[in-house]
Amino acid sequence: HGLNYIPYREATKEEVNAIYQKVMAGETCTTEEAEKYQTYILIHLGKQYHRLGIAMQFHYNCLRGMNRKMNSLLGPDTGFDMINTATCGGQIASLLSALNDTDECPKTIIYSLNPADDAQIGTILGCFQNSEIPGKIQHGSAWWFNDHKIGMEEQMTRLASLGLLGNFVGMLTD
């Protein structure tokens, strides 16, 4: 899932249905309502991933198309993106905790485009490991603006200082 930030706002099925009906009627939902809806969907999907044995992945903290003029001339995905600074460690932990409460937390990989989030992600990983699956919750590899020698070394150094580097999923190339 690629999100600007990871939301977490609890909602009942009735609340989510009301939000859906509101939007389908052409009304605009509030930020709080959007976060409730997104959270409900992410929890539902997480449970399905667990059932199917599929890893859930979160990519966050990227703002896309920030140069409006160039974005309108060249279109999306043409190089006008930037690192975001949304702080959402508490929301990520709450989302994983909600899935863990029902023993339906899937294998999960968490990527933030902001290297300042690495230590926070490292501590989140430790909150949800278990003895059934080594490295059940993983810190994704350094990516995009961090996919270079210094970025990878710094990310793996922080990961090794807070967790077990031997369970790291490894690096990737674009």
Name each region found by the language model.
Residues 174:
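Hydrophobic, well-ordered secondary-structure elements that form the walls
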Residues 136-138:
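Glycine-rich, often proline-containing surface loops adjacent to acidic residues and nearby aromatics
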Residues 1-107, 116-134, 151-170:
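Histidine/acidic residue-rich metal-binding segments in metalloenzymes
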Residues 144-146:
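Conserved blade-ending motifs and adjacent loop-strand segments that build the rim/top face
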